């Protein structure tokens, strides 16, 4: 097998799949999702909750504020958008 045929198959790396809540849907085809991380303090052992907001591509504009969504990492779609909406787990009440 030559090297050219081996290199033609591009490997997709492991994509991070996260679950979060939509906090904004005011942009076209973009939602802002808040992700939560829980870490334990190295010395004191207290659980610390940190949140981060990421911009997510929503092609069909189906997600609304308050929805619980599953997102996955993808190639950069813009300067700040690196995630894609996979599914809506729970609609807002």
Curated annotation (Swiss-Prot):
InterPro entries: NA-bd_OB-fold (IPR012340), Ribosomal_uS17 (IPR000266), Ribosomal_uS17_bact/chlr (IPR019984), Ribosomal_uS17_CS (IPR019979)
Keyword Ribosomal protein recorded: yes
Domain of life: Bacteria
GO molecular function, one term: rRNA binding
Keywords: Ribonucleoprotein, Ribosomal protein, RNA-binding, rRNA-binding
GO biological process, one term: translation
Alphabetical list of PROSITE patterns matching this protein: RIBOSOMAL_S17 (PS00056)
One family name in Pfam for this protein: Ribosomal_S17
One cellular component term from this protein's GO annotations in UniProt: cytosolic small ribosomal subunit
NCBIfam families: PRK05610.1, uS17_bact
HAMAP family: Ribosomal_uS17_B
Protein task: One of the primary rRNA binding proteins, it binds specifically to the 5'-end of 16S ribosomal RNA.
Similarity annotation: Belongs to the universal ribosomal protein uS17 family.
Oligomer status and interactors: Part of the 30S ribosomal subunit.
Protein name: Small ribosomal subunit protein uS17
Organism: Corynebacterium kroppenstedtii (strain DSM 44385 / JCM 11950 / CIP 105744 / CCUG 35717)
Gene that specifies this protein: rpsQ
